[in-house]
């Protein structure tokens, strides 16, 4: 384990600072004392939201401190846990309490974001027992997924290894039921979805498997893929209600949507991957460049990227296209694409990156990724930052204005998979032994 920090004062130290809501130096009485608490809570939330919108999410806390300084009545509202619950949801999009109080939750999210901006983190490599595999591809990681509690890694033989984030231990290995293969990589994991109590993963042959995270029961197949009629499942993701798959191999069947409660298919269609139909079949038998990426943005919107086009679809309305973004001249680097709840990052073949709104495709900011034209690039995004890895070096930009922040000190080699949320970054990279090395950076408030 190593700890890295580029600043001795990252705005997260101690228990004081902007969160203490200091009492005003000259308390004022009168009209301020009769303002009802719900009004003051609404005002504080609005001030925080306005500050985060105009100056960035880290501006919310100082703006709140100014509100709490107005008078003793306004200072008193800072003790309302209901207020901090509203603030955690509106500013940090947190609806699940991970700490003792919502005030603690808000403080933690602010300090973690500050750590991310100032390169303050701890670094680990995750360990697992490789002796239970018998194929050379079995230790090659193909995808990574993060939740609040777990990191899941999907491998080329269909295995998913689950790690607990608080102690970084490998706690469970999941394998799909045995089935005939349609090629060397037909059982490779395409994507993983982690919910509160279960883990769902899909393989390139189109199968979807479900297992309880607590270890009760075996992995079961929720959906049996039809590889002949659908092609290869090149990416898979999901949210609270939906599973979504991106297929390549058969024209007109790019998107598949399932209701994850009933496990029934609700939509099949789309032409996004039609130009990649032939290459879709090659992905089952040989290592190829990534043909497509698929992400959930918000609760019920999916964003997909191929070399030539980005498409936004509405899951509630079963695949209705609500936005398109084409790059017919230079082409896009698929592995440089990712999305958060509001925006996506696209990267063209010359290294020009842009952050665009999911709903409107409006450009938020732009930045340049050096070396993208000559080297393989793997990227991801969280709420505030875009990370791009090329040549073993991972660089970080903020996504509100496109400002370059820093490069991660640890070198990772050739990257096979990458994922980030607001606290963690995980990378799987190749090694000389053919076993993927899983790197983990933790920016949690220290």
From Swiss-Prot:
Keyword Nucleus assigned: yes
GO molecular function terms listed in the Swiss-Prot or TrEMBL record: DNA-binding transcription factor activity
Keywords of this entry: Developmental protein, Differentiation, Flowering, Nucleus, Repressor, Transcription, Transcription regulation
InterPro entries listed in its UniProt record: F-box-like_dom_sf (IPR036047), WD40/YVTN_repeat-like_dom_sf (IPR015943), WD40_repeat_dom_sf (IPR036322)
Localisation: Nucleus
Function: Transcriptional regulator involved in the specification of floral identity. Acts as A class cadastral protein by repressing the C class floral homeotic gene AGAMOUS in the external flower organs in association with APETALA2 and other repressors. Is required to maintain floral meristem identity in concert with AGAMOUS. Also interacts with APETALA2 to ensure the normal development of ovule.
Protein name (Swiss-Prot/TrEMBL): Transcriptional regulator STERILE APETALA
Species assigned in the record: Arabidopsis thaliana
Name of the gene: SAP
